[in-house]
Amino acid sequence: MPRLEESEIKKYWQIFQGLKPENNKVSGEQVSPVLKNSRLPQQQLASVWTLSDIDNDGKLDFEEFCITMRLIFDLINGSISEVPLQLPLWLIPSSKAALIQANQAVNLGRNLGIDYDDDDDGLTDDFDWYISPADKSTYETIYQLKNDRFGRIRFDSLESLYATLRNVPKSEISSAWNLVNPKSFETIDKDQTIVFLHILNQRENGKRIPRGVPASLRATFSKEIPNYNLDAQVKPQHTTQTQASKRSFAEDYLTKLGHNGKSLFSLLAPLSSGNDRGTDFSATQGTDWEEVRLRRELTDLENLLEKIQNRSDKDKKDDEEQRMVKYEFEQLLKYKQEQYDRQQREREVEGSGGSGLKQVEK
């Protein structure tokens, strides 16, 4: 059978829009008149729907609708006599290839009588959604190496990473991809990539992949422009992985790529050494020393940002990398400034009187 032609897709688009889709999807009730007009047997129509509804949500997006229409036309025209057991490769949307692959793997396991009892797979249920700074740095390094010019990541762009995972079957890699990509787009952004890699990391270390994601992440992944905020994740009081296992994720992979697991922040080591480190007032948090500490951090960050800018002017070869480092420090500086301003407002509400530490600061 030939591939879908552009004129054919345009025709399906007109029909799809005529059904007045909601959230870019049409329900069975909306599609029912179109299906019944084909005068095909009810059993065949049901099989077409089952085959086309790839994500099993009871609705069809435009790609799934195109599959439905093409199968119906082929049945009517006699190009095929029966609904195929699975979609031909030429009819599979690239954005849903990973999902179909995962579904086929599960179905194959059922047909072979493979036991998927969670209690017997040797995995634990203590999956941890918290992403430590060290892990996040590793994930960001992989993202920087593999994203395209639009800042997006394709599923197959990480094939070389998948090959280094000894304990993660291909079907579970696809499942992890689908968790962070509920809209089945062909690519995912940085925020989704970080969580995707974290899921693979946890699974590689013996943690069972959850069946869903937290509500906050689910809402984030459903947006066109996610608002991923690591600070919103609550750090647990216990660690579920050893430090050695955390360091091991993607270490071989990054070594092959010549990065040896280093993050972008490793570039700042020469800039933040010596006298630029400042005094650590972390033990005094919650006292008036917190104000002194914040003011010192703001000053240090401003000085460090200035050095980064001067370095960028002198060395244009690392322009893209410098921009990323600069952006990350600008965001950190903004956060610290807001934290300091908020503390100042709270002090104004509480009123003055007391500590005498402002005299020390002066």
From Swiss-Prot:
Task performed by this protein: Component of the PAN1 actin cytoskeleton-regulatory complex required for the internalization of endosomes during actin-coupled endocytosis. The complex links the site of endocytosis to the cell membrane-associated actin cytoskeleton. Mediates uptake of external molecules and vacuolar degradation of plasma membrane proteins. Plays a role in the proper organization of the cell membrane-associated actin cytoskeleton and promotes its destabilization.
Binding residues annotated for Ca(2+), in chain numbering: D53, D55, D57, K59, E64
Protein name as annotated: Actin cytoskeleton-regulatory complex protein END3
The UniProt record lists the keyword Calcium: yes
Region (Disordered): 339-362
Family: Belongs to the END3 family.
Domain called EH: residue spans: 8-98, 135-224
Quaternary organization: Component of the PAN1 actin cytoskeleton-regulatory complex.
Pfam families assigned: EH, End3
Membrane topology classification: Peripheral membrane protein
Coiled coil: 287-348
Domain of life: Eukaryota
A molecular function (GO) term: actin binding
Entries under CDD domains matching the protein: EH
